[in-house]
Structures are given as C-alpha cells and as structure tokens.
Amino acid sequence: MYNYQFICEVCTNPTTIFSHKVGKWDVKAYIAQSPNGKWDYGYLAYYDDGGVVCPVMLQKDDKGLSEEGARVQALKAIDNFVRTMQETNKEDQSCLLDILWEEMQPKLF
C-alpha cells in the first residue's frame, strides 16, 4: 500500500489502468496527472518467489506525456520488467506477456 500512497502524494487521482494476477505474478499500472498538469505513470510488479519486487517507478518527463502516452509507457514498462525476469515460471511469464500484448494492441495501432 505504501507504493500506491506514494503515487497519491505526487499526483492527483491515480487511475489503475492494468491489474492482473497470473501464477505468482501480481502487476498493476497506474496513470495520474501531476500537479503541473503533465501525465505520469507508475507500476507495481511483484513476483512472489524469493521476494523479487519492483517498486513503483514514477516517471517524470519534462516534455510531458499525454494521458494516452502515459498509458502506453506504463504498459511498456511492465512488459520490459516481465521480460527481464530470469527466475520465473516461464509458462506464467508467457501468459502475462500475452495479456500485456492484448492490452497494448489497441493503443499501439
């Protein structure tokens, strides 16, 4: 819960845009409008096997992101994190990547 509170402190009204549990994976992506009016994103990606945790990474772009841009970047960040995990169940990892791909399709094309 601390991570979600961190986003709330920095941005107003964070919105969960993606939330899935697959096997030992639990991932969530958020977007929020920062006080300066720009859109930021954050994500939580937990893999419960040995306590591997990726905390919220709130991104700030000086040029700013559109709301849709923040959505795409959040999903890409989770995809990248999941792909780089070495010590995971490959079947669960593949399933989660498929879900992410399906979620990204309408936003990429």
Residue ranges and their predicted role:
Residues 9-11, 23, 44-52, 86:
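Short linear sequence elements within intrinsically disordered, low-complexity coil regions
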Residues 27, 41-43, 68, 72:
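N-terminal cationic amphipathic segment used for targeting or macromolecule association
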Residues 1-26, 106-109:
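Negatively charged, low-complexity tracts enriched in Asp/Glu with abundant Ser/Thr
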Residues 3-4, 50-109:
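Mixed-charge, Lys/Arg-enriched low-complexity segments
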Residues 26-32:
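Periodic aromatic/glycine/histidine/acidic cluster detector
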Residues 32-57:
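Short aromatic-glycine-(Arg/Gly/Cys) micro-motifs in beta-strand/loop hairpins
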